[in-house]
């Protein structure tokens, strides 16, 4: 291929054997690599700049370790939930406890940043990723469908997210 960027290629496998793909997007000014693991923005390169504009890992293991939050689309609830519980529509729900104390952080081990997203659609300058989270996953109510679109135009990267649920549920991603 002689230096040509492949639009979709393997990035490797998670420790539990799930395949991770990387999607390369390109404009005249920008090249962006998105991963299906956590919808991670893995690499951003601006034409004429010799270094990457983002921090990332060259392999899946990095994103399963200390870089698990780097560049990923986190949720369904980002940050912390004090006490690992919340009342939603009159019912109390319990969430995964973080090792650092009595709180849930970034939706726990089943958060969106730990999931493999599906490639629904792609082109040279965009990709649409989808993810379905089942009712009760991570303690959160509702069957949730999330769509995430990355577009590049010129030197700009735009991310658009939409979500739906069949039940009241907290959704505060980042």
Predicted regions, residues:
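Surface-exposed acidic/polar loop and edge beta-strand patches at domain peripheries
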Residues: 2-174
């Amino acid at each position: 291929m002689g230096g040509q960027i492949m639009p979709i290629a393997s990035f490797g496998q998670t420790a539990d054997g799930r395949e991770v793909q990387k999607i390369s997007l390109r404009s005249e000014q920008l090249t962006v690599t998105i991963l299906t693991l956590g919808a991670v923005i893995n690499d951003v390169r601006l034409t004429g700049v010799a270094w990457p504009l983002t921090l990332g890992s060259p392999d899946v293991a990095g994103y399963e370790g200390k870089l698990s939050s780097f560049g990923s689309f986190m949720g369904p609830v980002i940050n912390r939930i004090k006490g690992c519980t919340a009342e939603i529509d009159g019912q109390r729900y319990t969430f995964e406890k973080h090792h650092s104390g009595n709180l849930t952080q970034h939706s726990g081990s089943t958060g969106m940043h730990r999931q493999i997203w599906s490639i629904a659609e792609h082109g040279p300058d965009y990709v649409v990723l989808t993810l379905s989270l089942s009712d009760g996953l991570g303690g959160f109510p509702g069957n949730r469908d999330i769509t995430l679109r990355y577009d590049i135009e010129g030197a700009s990267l735009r991310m658009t997210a939409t979500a739906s649920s069949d039940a009241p549920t907290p959704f505060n991603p980042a």
